[in-house]
Amino acid sequence: MTAQAGQYLFDEPLKVPTIQLEYTTVWSFPERGSWATHKSDYRGNFAPQIARNIIEMYSRKGDCVLDPMVGAGTTLIEAKLLARDAVGIDINPDAAKLSAEAIRFKHSPASRQEVKIGDARDLSFLDDDSIDLVLTHPPYMNIIKYSNGQIEGDLSNIGSLPKFCDEIEKIAAQLFKVLKPDKYCAILIGDTRKGRHFVPLAFSVMQRFLKVGFVLKEDIIKIQHNCTMTGRWRPKALKDGFYLIMHEHLFVFRKPRPGENLSRIRYSTNI
């Protein structure tokens, strides 16, 4: 099912704001971008600066970008501003509707964006080796329950790390199929804490992407700012002796070429 949007929100094409692109593996955006139709009121969405940097680095105009857990549409907005075609998928109809609304603006040169209600574990509607770039930001287990248990298959309902990673592996396998060889898949994922102890969610997810055949190109540390829960958790952290997690991992994976000799990069593979 495709999420429908109405007429354009703006009469004139929007201009692409210029931002300084990143060149290190530590990214920090104290002020999240608010240009075009970007909004910060969808809990858990990522800063548009992340999408801008990844799309600029790993794709070209006219390429097709896929976000299989599109949320409020950050990836699709930036894809449109940068003249990339894009497909966004979300299992939550409310999120799909938000994304469809977010891309209701004119831009030149023209490109095509589409939002579908669907499950990232089934990308059979896409051809194999058809996508130029994947960029996504999945739920961090059940830290934020986007559908409150009402949508079957919603990853944000899963509280078990092994179960969550099993489902992520299914998604990773689908992404590996539809991504073109020698192209890139970027995923922003953070960690969590249980019983005052660190749970390495990000690295567990990373291992599942390596398992299906991806190789690790980059591990970018993204500093978190303006977290609404920081003030609430600070006294408890000081009292109980643990540190607040204030970073996320932006993993960039590459799909190897057919028959590619991976011996030189074997330590970036599933070993």
What is each PLM-predicted segment?
Residues 1-271:
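Class I S-adenosyl-L-methionine-dependent methyltransferase catalytic core
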